[in-house]
Amino acid sequence: MSLEKTTRMNYLFDFYQSLLTSKQKSYMSLYYLDDFSLGEIAEEYDVSRQAVYDNIKRTEAMLEQYEEKLLLFKKFQERKEMFTKLKELASGLQEEEKMTALIEALEKLD
């Protein structure tokens, strides 16, 4: 699995985990956050490796559907990019400290 996919799934899980069942949360948390293998998760829950795989794949698809409709991750990335640009622009201003403090306050609101 690519690092890019893992990072994306971690973000999607972070944004949308409240919409998942407790089993989906557990499987995704163990697989993506705790780096458990499918076999280790299957052993932990006394189910087949295939059952874990199917559950994780369905959950990944659900997370992608949520993102397609709600765009929380996309908007997060856009805000992050805008904050970076604001910081770059503020670094050339005389009121840099005030501008930087304002930007940092905005970032904390996220």
UniProtKB/Swiss-Prot annotation:
InterPro entries: RNA_pol_sigma_r3/r4-like (IPR013324), UPF0122 (IPR007394), UPF0122_fam_protein (IPR054831), WH-like_DNA-bd_sf (IPR036388). Pfam families: UPF0122. Signal peptide: none annotated. Coiled coil: none annotated. Belongs to the UPF0122 family. Might take part in the signal recognition particle (SRP) pathway. This is inferred from the conservation of its genetic proximity to ftsY/ffh. May be a regulatory protein. This is UPF0122 protein RBAM_015800. It comes from Bacillus velezensis (strain DSM 23117 / BGSC 10A6 / LMG 26770 / FZB42) (Bacillus amyloliquefaciens subsp. plantarum). The lineage of its organism: Bacteria, Bacillati, Bacillota, Bacilli, Bacillales.
